[in-house]
Amino acid sequence: MSNQMNTMDITEILKYLPHRYPFLLIDRVLDYTPGESLHAIKNVTINEPFFQGHFPVQPVMPGVLILEAMAQATGLLAFKTMSDDVPPPGVLYYFAGIDNARFRRVVEPGDQIHFDVKMIKERRGIGVFYGEAKVDGEVVCSAEIMCARREINQ
């Protein structure tokens, strides 16, 4: 049994996710097991564009962006589950639904968010996942996320 970790740096992440600045919200994948789980990080800095308006006096990362980052992590897990190869052009995983989202504390500049997502089930291109976002080991957000595999015309 191997203890080798499967990682993804930003160069590899860019091959899987269509998101680009300012909406690419995953910096690195620390480990993943196709069909099971993925652990990714987001380094939150004061340079994030959303901090200009949310909120200038007391900067707080918007909860919807924490959920978006979690959805991007589920997309990476879905792609790695489908195949270890880079996806063909025009194949995407769309954020299709969310249930039981809960926010437990704020995320501020200087925090590093750890995303742990687990695949619950997949059927006919629809994946259901459970995810948690943590800062310093404390859960800041949790949710059940659905994503759908789609081919788009280019």
From Swiss-Prot:
GO biological process: fatty acid biosynthetic process; lipid A biosynthetic process
Compartments, as annotated in UniProt: Cytoplasm
InterPro entries assigned to the protein according to its UniProt record, in alphabetical order: FabA_FabZ, FabZ, HotDog_dom_sf
EC nos: 4.2.1.59
Molecular function as annotated in GO: (3R)-hydroxyacyl-[acyl-carrier-protein] dehydratase activity
Name of the top EC class for this enzyme: lyase
Location, primary (coarse class): cytoplasm
CC terms in the record's Gene Ontology section: cytoplasm; membrane
Stretches of the chain forming a coiled coil according to its record: none
Matching Gene3D superfamilies: Hotdog Thioesterase
Active site annotation, chain numbering: 54
Database matches in Pfam families: FabA
UniProt keyword terms in alphabetical order: Cytoplasm, Lipid A biosynthesis, Lipid biosynthesis, Lipid metabolism, Lyase
Annotated catalysed reactions: a (3R)-hydroxyacyl-[ACP] = a (2E)-enoyl-[ACP] + H2O
Organism domain of life: Bacteria
UniProt family annotation: Belongs to the thioester dehydratase family. FabZ subfamily.
Listed HAMAP family: FabZ
NCBIfam families, A to Z: fabZ (TIGR01750), PRK00006.1 (NF000582)
The protein's name: 3-hydroxyacyl-[acyl-carrier-protein] dehydratase FabZ
Species assigned in the record: Shewanella sp. (strain MR-4)
Lineage per the UniProt record: Bacteria, Pseudomonadati, Pseudomonadota, Gammaproteobacteria, Alteromonadales
